[in-house]
């Protein structure tokens, strides 16, 4: 991704999702809990969707934004997809394939409504 700064809008989503993730984490082993990196990534994906902007960010870019590693980012993306919070598709742009992440409104609303009942749709 270039050094061009992409503008995105803040939304009230952040606190609601963070609260739901906190409730989900209660009593779970650390390995099953949502992390701050998970919250940061879904927040970025939602912000771009909220701004009607496609989210093509690379793992390297997301690692910089979340102060982690590309491998940790990929694990987080897989987890968010497995819980139905975001979607991934591949799109062609400028003659090359790029991953596009989108916010799954229905899945996220279901999660926020009853985080304790959330289960992964598939293993990461």
Per-region residue spans from a language model:
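Short recognition helix of helix-turn-helix/winged-helix DNA-binding domains
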Residues: 1-72, 94-95
């Amino acid at each position: 991704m270039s050094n061009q700064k992409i503008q995105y809008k803040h939304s009230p989503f952040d606190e609601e999702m963070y609260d739901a993730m906190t409730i989900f984490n209660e009593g779970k082993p650390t390995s099953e809990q949502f992390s701050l990196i998970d919250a940061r990534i879904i927040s970025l994906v939602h912000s771009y969707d909220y701004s009607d902007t496609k989210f093509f960010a690379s793992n390297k870019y997301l690692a910089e934004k979340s102060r982690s590693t590309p491998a940790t980012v990929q694990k987080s993306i897989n987890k968010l997809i497995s819980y139905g919070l975001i979607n991934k598709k591949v799109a062609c742009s400028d003659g090359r394939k790029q991953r596009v992440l989108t916010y799954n409104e229905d899945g996220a609303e279901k999660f926020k409504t009853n985080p304790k009942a959330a289960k992964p749709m598939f293993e990461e």
